[in-house]
Amino acid sequence: MRLTRVTLFFIVLILGLGFFRLIDYLLQDLEFQTLQATEESMVDTANILASYVETEGTLAGLSKIFDNSYNRNIEALIFKQLKTNVGLNAYLTDDKGIILFDSGYPKNIGEDFSKFRDIRLTLAGKYGARSSRTDENDKNSSVMFVGAPVHKDGKIVGCLSVYKAQADVLPFVQERRRDI
């Protein structure tokens, strides 16, 4: 009888530890998967906006697009989270990485961003993306950046990067963690 109880105890213990590891894995992987999905849609957006700049050839239209989108009344209930504003920004550089337009921080215009990974790699014809913190001590202050090349006559003449604060996505992650 004693052997049966000990065996049963170890079976329950092993199953409990396995279940705990599974839940722990799912919870840890959830944020990573959510950020991957966000990055994927940012790649699309960056390329659409880069194509727009190639087609239109002016910054005025790009500025107007962002101004209009920031002034829209948004009430989108997405998985129990209410979205009320556009959380995506973009900047455009020339072929040297100098900022020509920044929808979120116009004071950056004229700054050299060529050292940043999203710009440097995109201008070199590769996939350029990065994540940077606005406050090194706060892991929730990360901002995701994804670049797309702007072409003219077959040459890369600039980079259009879209950027989004990870804090915009974290409420979805937290809600899913509660659900799990």
Role assignments for model-derived ranges:
Residues 1-26:
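Extreme N-terminal signal-anchor transmembrane helix of membrane signaling/transducer proteins, especially
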Residues 14-17, 25-51, 69, 175-179:
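Juxtamembrane membrane-water interface segments immediately C-terminal to a transmembrane helix
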Residues 36-72, 95-100, 104-105:
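Extracellular/periplasmic ligand-binding regions of membrane signal-transduction receptors
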Residues 66-72, 98-100, 104-140:
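Extracytoplasmic/periplasmic sensor domains and loops in membrane signaling proteins
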Residues 77-99, 127:
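Short N-terminal helix-loop-first-beta-strand/juxtamembrane motif that initiates sensory/input modules
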Residues 136, 151-153, 161-178:
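Helix-start (N-cap) segments at beta->loop->alpha junctions
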Residues 139-149:
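A short beta-strand signature within small-molecule sensing/ligand-binding domains used
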Residues 156:
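Glycine-rich acetyl-CoA-binding "A-motif" of GNAT/NAT acetyltransferases
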